[in-house]
Amino acid sequence: ALSCQDDDFTQPVISFTASSASVNTQYQRRDQHLRSKDFFDVKSFPNITFQSTSLEPNHINGDFLMRGILGIRGIEHEMTVDVEYGGTMTDNEGQMRCGFSLYGKISRAAFGMTWNRPLACGGVLISDEVRLQGNMQFILKQ
């Protein structure tokens, strides 16, 4: 959901809730493991949440930096994501739409997801750093 206190989009609030069981890597065995207690523990923690706290212009590239609180497995941490504004348009039905792309990184261990497996050649199977990417489209509510 997106809400704004004003028409010029200077103070937007973005929040979302996603089902942790909706994880889909296109590989069923891996998805089942990701839904287990080793990772998302979807039976105990069915939702992933995000609530923005601020949106500021990114003077480096002209887009935005959004700060907010991400909740996974009942653990909340502040995070910052890069936001690219994709544009605004009126669709064929006369509805105003705007699009955004989001990019960020988190530590999965910070959210209690520490499972890993050592590799024979050294190192571990899974990186702690997880890159997040998402696309959003909003429709102006009349």
Regions found by a protein language model. Give the residues of each.
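Low-complexity, acidic/polar, glycine-enriched regions of mature
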Residues: A1-Q142
